[in-house]
């Protein structure tokens, strides 16, 4: 068992309970989906909702866009994902 209260996690008792309850409530498809990141090939709301609902992705890497476009994309994804997503970016060119 992983000690989630120790380095590098430092989770509280409530945080540990959330993690344990969340994992216990996940289907096998949801657990597998958490291993994958989507490359954000579209910012259309219907596509974004389908991606999190069908594939249960663990995160997304956004493509170059305005701050407002990236914000809206992430808002839609987070609001429709059962589990908070990790958001990644391409920062070697300043985050695009």
Where are these regions (language model features)?
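N-terminal beta-rich core of secreted/periplasmic extracellular enzymes
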Residues: 1-96
